[in-house]
């Protein structure tokens, strides 16, 4: 019988009673939601799989510093890979969340025009969403806004009923857990330090030894350009883009049960400071948007805290009466540059021309969380087009939900 392994947090060692092999069919570099989605997707096939993550835990980068929104796909430009994988990923994320027991909720979402002059922009967003295949979009008036979100101030809004919220790190862990249960190996605290190209694949150097692999899938997020450079691929430059957040106390969930966004600028560079309820009852304010030189610069500032509050209170004045308990920042991997020379950049998913059987996923920013399962399917297609891979009859798709201490009764906590 296929053995299942259930983890409530990521692992820093291989989960197996056997010694770790040194040869694999596919090595995934990066243990965020995209890397773990790729690992889980490839575990459906008869492949020996390894994931390398440089941090002590999974989901330590982009995957923990975001809004946790399941996007419906109307905010991304039509005809792009972002749009295609977002809309395709929408149903995939909900399906995976059910199969893997991941907390999530289909909340709907409102993009709110405080001023009537912003209605044309809502019409543009709806038309873009219709082209992209986003389901159920509708422009609603003040009375409908009050019915959906009584505490939101606005004249008009674009309603997206299929938008939702999910715990991004729990989703990442669940994908990894499913892959582990289907035979994949994961090494956390194991950065990739060297790459040697060989006729039959690659030799990957790490502090824990070297691993031979026929394929490499680069899902390293902010470091994807540097990981590619280790293999001599100098095609990419990633810029770090910091977004600061504020977290309102759990009582704030009483006044907002649906994500609320302002009308975004026409260049689609930024969605604006939005308000997002969490599955735990808190409300997130943010993110802000600023390029930073250091890819690890996740600092928060008082000036931005004040700005986040001011913009949030314009949409939901009732939030003024709740305390804010924490601030944090997340970083996004931008392919557009701070100088504005590159105006628009799409997701990149491609096999390297220089290094056969090396697949790069670069610039996977928002809506990367929603797009992750679709991006993973693309990787499987790239590998499947080059060699014969067969689905495993013993693949275990489902995972029981992991019990949470906070959800138990007194006896269960004792």
Indicate where each model-derived feature is located:
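C-terminal catalytic lobe of FAD-dependent flavoproteins
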Residues: 270, 279-280, 291, 295-408
């Amino acid at each position: 019988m296929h053995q299942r392994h259930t983890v409530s947090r990521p692992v820093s060692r291989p989960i197996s009673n056997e010694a770790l092999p040194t040869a694999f069919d596919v090595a995934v570099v990066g243990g965020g939601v995209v890397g773990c989605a790729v690992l889980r997707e490839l575990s459906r096939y008869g492949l020996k799989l390894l994931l390398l993550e440089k941090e002590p835990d999974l989901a330590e980068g982009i995957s923990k510093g975001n809004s946790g929104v399941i996007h419906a796909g109307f905010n991304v430009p039509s005809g792009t890979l972002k749009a295609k994988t977002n809309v395709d990923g929408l149903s995939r994320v909900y399906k995976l969340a059910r199969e893997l027991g991941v907390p999530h909720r289909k909340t709907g979402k409102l993009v709110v025009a405080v001023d009537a002059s912003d209605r044309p922009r809502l019409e543009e967003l709806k038309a873009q969403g219709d082209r992209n295949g986003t389901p159920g979009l509708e422009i609603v008036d003040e009375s409908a806004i009050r019915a959906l979100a009584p505490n939101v101030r606005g004249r008009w809004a674009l309603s997206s009923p299929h938008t939702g919220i999910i715990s991004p790190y729990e989703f990442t862990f669940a994908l990894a857990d499913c892959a582990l249960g289907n035979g994949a190996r994961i090494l956390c605290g194991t950065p990739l330090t060297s790459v040697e190209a060989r006729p039959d694949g690659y030799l990957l150097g790490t502090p824990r030894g070297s691993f031979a692999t026929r394929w490499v899938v680069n899902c390293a997020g902010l470091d994807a350009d540097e990981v590619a450079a280790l293999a001599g691929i100098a095609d990419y430059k990633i810029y770090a883009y910091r977004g600061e957040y504020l977290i309102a106390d759990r009582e704030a969930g009483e006044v907002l049960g649906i994500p609320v966004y302002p009308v975004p600028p026409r260049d689609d560079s930024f969605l604006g400071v939005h308000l997002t309820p969490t599955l735990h009852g808190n409300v997130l304010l943010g993110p802000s948007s600023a390029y930073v030189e250091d890819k690890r610069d996740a600092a928060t500032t008082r000036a931005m805290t004040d700005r986040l509050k001011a913009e949030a209170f314009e949409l939901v004045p009732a939030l003024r009466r709740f305390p804010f308990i924490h601030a944090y920042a997340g970083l996004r991997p931008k392919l557009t540059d701070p100088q504005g020379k590159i105006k628009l950049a799409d997701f990149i998913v491609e096999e390297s021309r220089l290094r056969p059987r090396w697949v790069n996923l670069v610039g996977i920013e928002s809506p990367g969380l929603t797009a992750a399962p679709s991006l993973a399917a693309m990787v499987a297609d790239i590998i499947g087009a080059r060699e014969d891979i067969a689905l495993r009859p013993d693949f275990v798709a489902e995972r029981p939900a992991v019990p949470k201490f906070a959800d138990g009764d007194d006896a269960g906590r004792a």
